[in-house]
């Protein structure tokens, strides 16, 4: 007796659809992998290049993200804010973001780095409040994009989740004629000694796990 194979309709359709979805997901993962690898390489190239000394002369369209900078000016500590939900070596804390007035009177936001909950209050870390003119080395960063599940910034209640210069300057009521909204600067940690706030180490901290699923 000859048995004729007759595939069931709905299981077959489900299998085909699943196959198409998996192929599409794999293609998307590869594209993300190539994009992330290019981003990491760009970070290395720009951050290790000769620093520019007056980034305020450039708009976002004329200055590359991750470009190394070296600027002079003074911190406006009275207007610092705190980005919540940040960790350092598994410890919860905040990133301290402080306006920085450069020699040409332009004001740019500096992400000075991480502090623990116990040092969020500037009165408990007066040693970190540099006074007068200082030299700062850092890396240009474009305004952050709010993630889908990330709450909106709420400056009135002291909750900041995303570094968006336009929002921050508006909240601290800084003269819009002097502020830089196109980017902010990640401060680099200097030397081997770790001091608060803990700035970036100049290495690409960009997770690349798009082939590990």
Question: Can you say where each PLM-predicted feature lies in the sequence?
Answer:
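Surface-exposed, charge/polar-rich loops and edge strands
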Residues: 1-57, 67-213
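Juxtamembrane extramembrane loops of integral membrane proteins
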Residues: 58-62
């Amino acid at each position: 007796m000859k048995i004729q194979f007759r595939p069931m309709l709905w299981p077959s359709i489900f299998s085909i659809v699943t196959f198409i979805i998996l192929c599409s997901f794999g293609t998307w993962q590869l594209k993300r992998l190539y994009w992330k690898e290019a981003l990491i390489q760009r970070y290395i190239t720009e951050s290790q290049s000769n620093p520019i000394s007056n980034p305020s002369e450039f708009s976002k369209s004329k200055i590359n993200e991750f470009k190394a900078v070296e600027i002079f000016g003074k911190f406006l500590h009275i207007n610092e804010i705190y980005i919540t939900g940040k960790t350092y070596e598994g410890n919860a804390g905040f990133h301290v973001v402080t306006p920085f007035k450069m020699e040409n009177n332009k004001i740019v936001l500096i992400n000075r780095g991480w502090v623990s909950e116990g040092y969020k209050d500037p009165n408990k870390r007066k040693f970190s409040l540099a006074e007068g003119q200082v030299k700062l080395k850092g890396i240009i960063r474009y305004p952050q994009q709010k993630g889908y599940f990330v709450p909106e910034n709420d400056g009135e209640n002291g909750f900041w989740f995303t570094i968006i210069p336009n929002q921050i300057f508006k909240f601290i009521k800084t003269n819009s004629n002097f502020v830089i909204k196109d980017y902010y600067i990640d401060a680099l940690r200097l030397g081997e000694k770790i001091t608060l706030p803990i700035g970036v180490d100049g290495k690409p901290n960009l997770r690349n796990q798009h082939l590990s699923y």
